[in-house]
Amino acid sequence: MTFDIKIVLDIAISMFLVMLVGYFLRKFGIIDAKVSKSLSKLVLYVTQPVLIVISMIKMTCTAETTKQLGIILLVSLGVHVFAAIFGYISMKVMKEQNARKLSEHSIIFANVMFFGLPIVQSLFGDRGVAWASFFSVIFHIFAWTYGMLVLGRGRDDIKLSLKKVLLNFGTIPCLIGIVLYFVSGLNIPQELLSGLAGVKKALDYLGGLCTPISLLVLGGVLTTLPLKKLFNNWRIYYVCLMKLVVFPLIVYLVAKFVLNIGDEMSMFTMIMAGLPTASLTNMFAELYDIEPGYAATSVGMTTVFSVATLPFIVWVAQLF
């Protein structure tokens, strides 16, 4: 599968411009911290789950589609396990424990939903959203298991939570979407389906809010970061290089030439692997007081640089 680099670049630039609007809205107080938090909750609790569910409903229930979704789950598991190994080895250069474990966490956990959904929706359509949603199931399980183990090194107060592993705003809408996906494969009377058209349209409207709101919030978050420190820490540049360039390209080569899962799914997997660090890293750092400034800087810098690195790695991948 060949992607027009101009299309990928246009997507990245358009996302950056919306983030820039969010940056200035927060900078000038039009969106303050309270509003930003409310918008984040709106995305997390409403628009993102609705987008996940509606993307699953739009997929036609076939044996091939079901097989693809199963493959995505296995691929996501493989990517996260490999990211854990890659992060552990590549971050050994950092001697300070907090910086090292936060950097590992940054490598492993990508901003699949807030940043990834707009990209894969533009490149792959509703199918891409469904793929990303399934990919995020493993993300959430991994975040509340291995992610806790990484952050818990040298700490006695950071524990695993089985409840949060199973019940969160990533896995629950996926489960609902899976049920509706299989129900759609049944012979449902056309009269009933036409009667639900208005409901489906309302869900489309709500799901459509996810991308612009999440990008505005992301842009606003950048105003809270120490800009001078953003550009004066070699560790952050190293994390960006490993996270946004080296790791996703290795993932692509393995997916395409070792796993042989096809060009389209290999490209999708690489994009997922090359997304910026999830805001979850900063959230946990704040919660457990693990150098939150460093975590915020990591999230901010990978987000900014990814606007350039995503088109770059797509271009490089198409050379193979």
Model regions and ranges:
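Alpha-helical transmembrane segments of multi-pass small-molecule/ion transporters
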Residues: M1-F320
